Amino acid sequence: MLKKIIILFLGIFLLSSCTDNFRNYFQRSANNKLFDVKGAKGGKRKPVYNNKYIALAKKNIVEDNIDYDNDVDDNYDNDGPLISEKIDNVKRNREMYLNMIKSDIARQKAEFSATQSNNVMTLSKANKKVRKDDSYKEKKIEEELNQIKAMLKETKRDITKYTCPNATVNQNYVPPVTNYEHVNYPPIKNSNPYNNTSKVKQKFIREDDDDTNNACSI
């Protein structure tokens, strides 16, 4: 058992010696994660910068407000063989931010074109809108008609409550004319006096009395 522990310890030590720095091997990533498998591209990870710093750098690039470092690094000898391998950090950063600005402009153009295409009124969209408006209007008109029908039914029901139950509706009834002009006819000569005791006259009087008794009182 002790031999296995010693072999395991030596194996871990040998594997850790392959790294550049054993302490930095288990450090968190730029995204503050211990095991981060997202964002890696080509075996390299883009560092996470401060958004305010990036916005300020883009603004300086657009406004051409760049401070060039004219100081010569002491680690490089002007006459030495490594002068050609010196990296221009200002130029590299400028190119990086220019690429970021170009990508932002392309993304903004794509978003603007997408919104414009959605806002453009085509024939099909216009037809759909007209159909929707027409269907809404038809629905409102139908609701109003149903309300009017219900009101008419209720009014008719109220009217039937106040009608005489014994009264019959005569379809051929014509209301009497009351706005006629009075005409004075000449008296009829040689007319016989009315017989008040005639049976026919008494019959009509009885019928009139029956009609008045069956009439509805107001």
Swiss-Prot record:
It comes from the Bacteria. A lipid is attached at residue 18 (S-diacylglycerol cysteine). Residues 1-17 form the signal peptide. One of its GO terms (cellular component) is plasma membrane. It is found in: Cell membrane. It is a lipid-anchor. Residues 136-164 form a coiled coil. Keywords: Cell membrane, Coiled coil, Lipoprotein, Membrane, Palmitate, Signal. A lipid is attached at residue 18 (N-palmitoyl cysteine). This is Uncharacterized lipoprotein RT0399.
